[in-house]
């Protein structure tokens, strides 16, 4: 939960506005790509094609917990599966919406 609050605070400070779902997805995406790149052990001497192949393979081998969801995995076709995190704003306060 702390990561969500920090993201919102940092976003508001940097952009003078409230982040939307696309901002949260983009934020998570950067860190997912970072994790896949580390898993793939990318090196500067690799060709772009080899990097792409290694990243694609690594994406099917990682399982991540990020701000927008938990236990996120990807199929060989690139389709994600996750337990989504839903955040609502009530009275200016961010709250995680839990399933009942």
Predicted regions and their residues:
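Extracytosolic ligand-binding ectodomains
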Residues: 1-100
